Design a protein with these regions (language model features):
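Short catalytic/ligand-binding loop motif for oxyanion handling, primarily in non-cytosolic enzymes
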Residues: 51-54, 99, 144
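Active-site Asp-x-Gly
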Residues: 130-173
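A conserved alpha-helical element in kinase catalytic cores
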Residues: 1-52, 58-81
Length: 217
């Protein structure tokens, strides 16, 4: 685990408006021996709701209420407004350019222009709960293209169109912007890269290719 992910939960503790477990206590130490190993332990408030999915890619529709989508919107907006200098690999303008060029082999349209803000880069269906919304793991948040978290959640719901439509409607103010469209291309490219190593029974890769074609034309 990278150093940034290692302290992600602790560094997220002051962020108001994000639905997440509260950090109660944290301690770091090193094991004894000729090659000490760093160890961290955290105590968080209990989350009783289960993950919305057993996989990061949504296969079946979970129980999602209007309150759930309201809390999702509030969380995404609160995180976006929180300043950070946290950085993770891939999530910078230069790396995005390489990624999109390698994935799509064509220019990015003029209406897809990245802005940067604070995003959760692992906002997936296995990392959020239902029927009440909560992000379980706050390790991977950082500066990224604005809209990345929303884009990742939306695109990984495409196998369940009714839920994908709800996510898109709830987060349209982010997704339907120049940066939101760019974020969708980035998120789709990273998902496609992951799918080369994972089973794809619902043909998510094909759905992503079809969808990104609409963004690129």
């Amino acid at each position: 685990m990278s150093g940034k992910a290692w302290r992600g939960t602790a560094e997220a503790a002051p962020i108001a408006g994000v639905s997440k477990p509260a950090l109660l206590h944290r301690i770091e130490w090193h094991t004894d021996g000729p090659q000490p190993v760093p160890v961290s332990a955290e105590v968080l408030t209990l989350v009783t709701d289960p993950p919305a999915s057993r996989e990061r890619f949504l296969r079946t529709a979970p129980d999602l209420s209007a309150d759930w989508f309201s809390d999702l919107r509030t969380t995404v907006a609160a995180l976006r407004a929180y300043p950070t200098d946290r950085q993770f690999p891939v999530h910078d303008a230069e790396e995005y350019g390489y990624l999109l060029s390698a994935t799509y082999r064509r220019p990015v349209p003029a209406d897809c222009v990245p802005a940067f803000g604070t995003e959760h880069i692992d906002l997936n269906w296995q990392n959020i709960t239902a029927p009440r919304f909560c992000i379980l793991d706050m390790e991977h948040w950082c500066s990224a293209v604005t809209g990345y978290g929303a884009a990742y959640l939306y695109l990984t719901a495409l196998e369940v169109p009714a839920v994908a439509d709800q996510v898109r409607e709830a987060l349209a103010d982010v997704l339907d912007t120049p940066s939101g469209r760019y974020a969708q291309l980035v998120a789709a490219a990273l998902i496609l890269r992951n799918l080369t190593r994972l089973p794809d029974p619902g043909r998510l890769a094909a759905r992503l290719r079809t969808y990104t074609d609409t963004l690129l034309t």
